[in-house]
Amino acid sequence: MGIFGTVAQTEQHYADIASGVAPQDPFIWSACWTLMDPSRAPDGKHTLILDTFVPSKLRDGAAWESRKHEFASRLLEKFRRYAPNMTARNILGEYIDTPESIERANPCLVNGATTGGERTLAQSGCFRPVPGYSQYRSPVRSLYLTGASCHPGGGITAMGMVTAQEILRDLAAKKP
């Protein structure tokens, strides 16, 4: 489930990121993976992920580690407007990632960018990986683009399939 506001709120979210401040009214992506894979939690329990974009570095120089609980509370407070049953009573534990912890766990995720590229509007959606190259072809003949840095972005597993379809389409067009 995605919780997004108006266009103006989304623009403000990205403006906050660009200026190095934690978004005041963040948009949220959520997933309850145990609905599809119950093995991810004990019987009768579920897992829930809340995700959003934040600046990799805070303008005031603070580490995200020192702000993560406050920011996670802000996300959960907003999420509760749509899922009021998410009370402290039924949250048994939490794990909060930060840009720093993500990069520590996997140095390839520079600045904690799990979706590849920067978390800016200019590198989102059809602008991935960069404007003009969202159709999985590079300017080099027979060199195709795929992966988290391509449209639609990391966390969505379609990029490999779409790239393969483009390659097959090109190969079919070359047949006599």
Residue ranges and their predicted role:
Residues 7-9, 33-37, 55, 119-121, ...:
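Short, glycine-/Ser/Thr-/acidic-enriched flexible segments
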Residues 31, 37, 41-50, 137, ...:
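Redox-cofactor-proximal catalytic regions of oxidoreductases
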Residues 42-74:
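Conserved FAD/dinucleotide-binding core of flavoprotein oxidoreductases
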Residues 23-31, 81, 85-151:
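A glycine-rich dinucleotide-binding beta-alpha-beta segment and adjacent secondary-structure elements
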Residues 45, 67-75, 114-176:
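C-terminal structured subdomain/cap of oxidoreductase catalytic cores
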Residues 1-40:
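Mid-domain catalytic core of redox enzymes
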Residues 2-9, 22, 63, 67, ...:
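Catalytic cores of large soluble enzymes that bind and process phosphate-bearing ligands
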